[in-house]
UniProtKB/Swiss-Prot annotation:
Belongs to the UPF0473 family. InterPro entries: UPF0473. It comes from Oceanobacillus iheyensis (strain DSM 14371 / CIP 107618 / JCM 11309 / KCTC 3954 / HTE831). This is UPF0473 protein OB2006. HAMAP family: UPF0473.
Length: 92
């Protein structure tokens, strides 16, 4: 999903502290009917190496969504392939 303006979301950490993230992209996997999101910290400087966080998510009726950690190797492989594809497209 290409975003014209960076979408931002707030994600609490394990201590309840909230952190602002920019959404890189979201994608759906038809076979599993799962949705995934990749984000980076919003306050990260441009020249720094970017740390990407990925989650599986489920949308709620009120336009909120719930994040779930990615736990299987297969899911991580799918997310990494999408990141690599995105990086290749940006370099082209």
């Amino acid at each position: 999903m290409a975003l014209e303006e960076k979408e931002r979301i707030i994600i609490p950490d394990e201590n309840g502290d909230e952190h602002l993230f920019e959404v890189l992209f979201t994608f759906d996997v038809d076979e599993t009917e799962q949705s995934y999101i990749a984000v980076v910290p919003a306050e990260q400087a441009e020249e720094e190496e970017v740390e990407v966080y990925a989650f599986r998510f489920e949308e709620q009726e009120n336009e909120d969504f719930t994040l779930f950690p990615i736990e299987s190797d297969d899911e991580w492989q799918m997310v990494e392939e999408m990141l690599n594809t995105l990086a290749e497209e940006e370099e082209a």
